């Protein structure tokens, strides 16, 4: 499986090949009447359509006035380097384990030379002890030695927004709450929703 930063870079490069312009270090501070203003410059961009795809926290959707009624579940993931025998044993398949955490699940994804191991839970149903749950899950997987590790926490939107369009603004992907409600995977539906809105705008068919 590919690392997310590598995949994102590929998407950016492909978009640029088709004429997209990448603005870096450009934080949107306001959206009014289709005009985007930025926190670190006086530049303004007027857009006929604004597609908001800024992830689960989606600060831009708040600026656009979208109500956030998604259910967000907390999760933690470790990128771990393990001994060769453990990597060989656990890199043969993708794992989802529904008994890894109370009211949640765990996952173990093989990457090029390490494992991505994490857990996510319904915070309304269980006292959140993500680190403890993940460490226990790794032991259940038979991982007793970790050579190196890095951890990051995040939230996963497992229910969609009631409102996906507001004026000329559209939310897609995790910003819209399109993660799979069973396994909480978001990339597939993010790509599908992006493709759908792009085709609809290209066709001039906003009822799709």
Feature-to-residue mapping (PLM):
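Short, surface-exposed charged micro-motifs
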Residues: 30, 107, 168
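FAD/FMN-dependent oxidoreductases across multiple families
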Residues: 44, 125-200
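Conserved N-terminal helical subregion
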Residues: 1-63, 71-73
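Fold-independent oxyanion-binding glycine-rich loops
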Residues: 26, 53-55, 99-101, 111, ...
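C-terminal helical "tail/cap" subdomain of flavin- and related membrane-associated enzymes
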Residues: 199-208
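Short secondary-structure junctions
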Residues: 19, 86-87, 141-146
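Conserved FAD-binding catalytic core of PHBH/FMO-like flavoproteins
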Residues: 57-130
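Structural motif
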Residues: 35, 114-116, 168
């Amino acid at each position: 499986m590919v690392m997310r930063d590598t995949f994102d870079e590929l998407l950016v490069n492909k978009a640029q090949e088709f004429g997209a312009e990448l603005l870096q270090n450009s934080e949107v501070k306001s959206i009014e009447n289709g005009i985007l203003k930025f926190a670190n410059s006086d530049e303004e961009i007027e857009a006929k359509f604004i597609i908001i795809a800024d992830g689960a926290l989606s600060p831009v959707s708040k600026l656009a006035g979208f109500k956030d009624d998604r259910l967000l579940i907390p999760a933690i993931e470790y990128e771990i380097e393990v001994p060769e025998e453990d990597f060989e044993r656990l890199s043969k398949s993708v794992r989802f384990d529904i008994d890894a955490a109370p009211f949640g699940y765990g996952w173990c994804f093989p990457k090029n030379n390490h494992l991505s191991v994490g857990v996510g839970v319904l915070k309304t149903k269980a006292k959140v002890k993500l680190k403890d749950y993940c460490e226990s899950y790794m032991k259940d997987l038979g991982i007793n030695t970790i050579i190196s590790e890095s951890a990051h926490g995040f939230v996963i939107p497992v229910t969609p927004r009631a409102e996906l369009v507001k004026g000329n603004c559209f939310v897609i992907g995790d910003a819209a709450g399109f993660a799979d409600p069973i396994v909480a995977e978001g990339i597939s539906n993010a790509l599908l929703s992006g493709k759908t809105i792009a085709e609809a705008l290209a066709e001039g068919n906003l009822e799709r």
